[in-house]
Amino acid sequence: LSLHDALPIWLAGWKRDELPLQQGDVTLPEGEFDATFDAHVVKRLTDVLVVSHEKTAQIVDARPAPRFNAEADEPRPGLKRGHIPGALNVPWGDLVFEGELKTTDELRAIFERQGVDLHRPIIASCGSGVTACVVILALATLGVSDVTLYDGAWSEWGARDDLPVEPAK
Protein backbone atom coordinates (compact mmCIF):
# COMPACT_ATOMS: atom_id res chain seq x y z
CA LEU A 1 0.00 0.00 0.00
CA SER A 2 1.56 3.27 -1.08
CA LEU A 3 0.63 6.77 0.01
CA HIS A 4 -1.10 7.18 -3.36
CA ASP A 5 -3.11 3.99 -2.75
CA ALA A 6 -4.15 5.31 0.67
CA LEU A 7 -5.87 8.42 -0.70
CA PRO A 8 -9.17 6.57 -1.29
CA ILE A 9 -9.01 5.31 2.32
CA TRP A 10 -8.59 8.85 3.65
CA LEU A 11 -11.35 10.10 1.36
CA ALA A 12 -13.68 7.38 2.66
CA GLY A 13 -13.09 8.62 6.21
CA TRP A 14 -13.71 12.21 5.09
CA LYS A 15 -17.01 11.20 3.46
CA ARG A 16 -18.01 9.03 6.44
CA ASP A 17 -17.64 12.06 8.72
CA GLU A 18 -19.75 14.08 6.26
CA LEU A 19 -17.06 16.72 5.81
CA PRO A 20 -17.47 19.16 2.91
CA LEU A 21 -16.43 18.20 -0.62
CA GLN A 22 -16.21 20.44 -3.64
CA GLN A 23 -14.94 20.51 -7.20
CA GLY A 24 -13.24 23.19 -9.22
CA ASP A 25 -10.26 25.47 -9.06
CA VAL A 26 -8.78 26.28 -5.68
CA THR A 27 -7.39 29.71 -4.86
CA LEU A 28 -5.48 29.90 -1.63
CA PRO A 29 -4.40 33.11 0.08
CA GLU A 30 -0.68 33.74 0.26
CA GLY A 31 0.92 33.03 3.58
CA GLU A 32 4.25 32.70 5.28
CA PHE A 33 5.71 29.62 6.83
CA ASP A 34 9.13 29.46 8.43
CA ALA A 35 10.41 25.90 8.35
CA THR A 36 13.25 24.90 10.63
CA PHE A 37 15.35 21.78 10.18
CA ASP A 38 16.32 19.79 13.26
CA ALA A 39 19.20 17.55 12.21
CA HIS A 40 18.96 15.60 15.47
CA VAL A 41 15.73 13.90 14.37
CA VAL A 42 17.08 12.67 11.03
CA LYS A 43 19.51 9.76 10.77
CA ARG A 44 22.01 9.16 8.00
CA LEU A 45 22.94 5.84 6.46
CA THR A 46 26.08 5.57 8.59
CA ASP A 47 24.03 6.14 11.77
CA VAL A 48 21.64 3.35 10.80
CA LEU A 49 24.49 1.00 9.88
CA VAL A 50 26.03 1.47 13.35
CA VAL A 51 22.64 0.94 15.05
CA SER A 52 22.06 -2.19 12.96
CA HIS A 53 25.33 -3.64 14.31
CA GLU A 54 25.31 -2.32 17.87
CA LYS A 55 21.55 -2.54 18.55
CA THR A 56 21.58 0.82 20.38
CA ALA A 57 18.15 1.63 18.92
CA GLN A 58 15.36 -0.22 17.16
CA ILE A 59 14.86 0.19 13.43
CA VAL A 60 11.16 0.13 12.54
CA ASP A 61 10.37 -0.36 8.85
CA ALA A 62 6.94 0.89 7.73
CA ARG A 63 6.85 -0.95 4.39
CA PRO A 64 4.25 -3.67 3.75
CA ALA A 65 5.26 -7.10 5.07
CA PRO A 66 5.78 -8.72 1.62
CA ARG A 67 8.38 -6.09 0.72
CA PHE A 68 10.01 -6.22 4.16
CA ASN A 69 10.19 -10.04 3.99
CA ALA A 70 11.66 -10.07 0.45
CA GLU A 71 8.52 -11.72 -0.94
CA ALA A 72 7.67 -8.86 -3.31
CA ASP A 73 9.64 -6.57 -5.59
CA GLU A 74 10.17 -2.96 -4.64
CA PRO A 75 8.25 -0.40 -6.71
CA ARG A 76 11.51 1.40 -7.50
CA PRO A 77 13.64 -0.42 -10.10
CA GLY A 78 17.09 -1.61 -9.06
CA LEU A 79 16.41 -2.05 -5.35
CA LYS A 80 17.10 -5.32 -3.59
CA ARG A 81 14.42 -7.23 -1.76
CA GLY A 82 14.55 -7.47 2.03
CA HIS A 83 15.28 -5.16 4.92
CA ILE A 84 17.98 -3.63 7.11
CA PRO A 85 19.38 -6.32 9.43
CA GLY A 86 17.67 -6.32 12.80
CA ALA A 87 14.77 -4.13 11.65
CA LEU A 88 11.24 -4.72 12.92
CA ASN A 89 8.27 -4.48 10.58
CA VAL A 90 5.31 -2.28 11.47
CA PRO A 91 3.50 -1.65 8.17
CA TRP A 92 2.13 1.87 8.19
CA GLY A 93 -1.19 0.67 6.77
CA ASP A 94 -1.76 -1.39 9.92
CA LEU A 95 -1.74 1.81 11.98
CA VAL A 96 -4.67 3.49 10.23
CA PHE A 97 -8.33 2.75 9.62
CA GLU A 98 -10.43 4.76 7.18
CA GLY A 99 -7.82 7.49 7.00
CA GLU A 100 -7.31 7.94 10.74
CA LEU A 101 -4.87 6.53 13.26
CA LYS A 102 -6.26 3.61 15.20
CA THR A 103 -6.95 4.01 18.92
CA THR A 104 -4.03 4.25 21.32
CA ASP A 105 -4.86 0.78 22.67
CA GLU A 106 -4.79 -0.66 19.15
CA LEU A 107 -1.55 1.16 18.29
CA ARG A 108 0.14 -0.01 21.47
CA ALA A 109 -0.93 -3.61 20.75
CA ILE A 110 0.40 -3.43 17.18
CA PHE A 111 3.82 -2.18 18.26
CA GLU A 112 3.96 -4.76 21.06
CA ARG A 113 2.97 -7.60 18.70
CA GLN A 114 5.76 -6.57 16.31
CA GLY A 115 8.34 -6.59 19.12
CA VAL A 116 8.85 -2.83 19.42
CA ASP A 117 9.89 -1.67 22.90
CA LEU A 118 8.35 1.78 23.33
CA HIS A 119 10.89 2.61 26.05
CA ARG A 120 13.93 2.27 23.76
CA PRO A 121 15.09 4.63 20.98
CA ILE A 122 13.46 4.07 17.60
CA ILE A 123 14.57 4.93 14.06
CA ALA A 124 11.64 4.86 11.63
CA SER A 125 12.24 3.95 8.00
CA CYS A 126 10.24 2.87 4.96
CA GLY A 127 10.70 2.85 1.18
CA SER A 128 11.46 6.52 0.65
CA GLY A 129 11.16 8.30 4.00
CA VAL A 130 7.49 9.28 3.67
CA THR A 131 5.31 6.56 5.18
CA ALA A 132 7.73 6.19 8.10
CA CYS A 133 6.19 9.47 9.22
CA VAL A 134 2.92 7.61 9.89
CA VAL A 135 4.88 5.39 12.30
CA ILE A 136 6.39 8.51 13.89
CA LEU A 137 2.93 10.08 14.25
CA ALA A 138 1.54 6.90 15.83
CA LEU A 139 4.47 6.79 18.27
CA ALA A 140 3.99 10.47 19.14
CA THR A 141 0.32 9.72 19.82
CA LEU A 142 1.51 7.11 22.33
CA GLY A 143 3.81 9.66 23.98
CA VAL A 144 7.00 8.09 22.61
CA SER A 145 9.52 10.87 22.02
CA ASP A 146 12.87 9.16 21.36
CA VAL A 147 12.09 8.65 17.68
CA THR A 148 14.09 9.68 14.62
CA LEU A 149 13.69 9.26 10.85
CA TYR A 150 16.03 7.53 8.41
CA ASP A 151 14.85 9.42 5.35
CA GLY A 152 17.33 7.74 3.02
CA ALA A 153 15.18 4.70 3.70
CA TRP A 154 15.15 1.53 1.63
CA SER A 155 15.58 3.55 -1.58
CA GLU A 156 19.10 4.36 -0.34
CA TRP A 157 19.95 1.16 1.57
CA GLY A 158 18.49 -1.28 -0.96
CA ALA A 159 20.37 0.34 -3.85
CA ARG A 160 23.79 -0.31 -2.30
CA ASP A 161 25.74 -3.53 -2.90
CA ASP A 162 28.06 -2.93 0.06
CA LEU A 163 25.37 -3.06 2.79
CA PRO A 164 23.96 -6.11 4.55
CA VAL A 165 20.38 -7.15 3.80
CA GLU A 166 18.01 -9.61 5.48
CA PRO A 167 16.87 -12.08 4.51
CA ALA A 168 20.24 -12.80 2.91
CA LYS A 169 19.91 -14.08 -0.65
Predicted regions mapped to residue ranges:
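Single conserved hydrophobic/aromatic residue that forms the stacking wall/gate
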Residues: 1-5
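Rhodanese-like catalytic fold shared by cysteine-dependent sulfurtransferases
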Residues: 6-58, 62-169
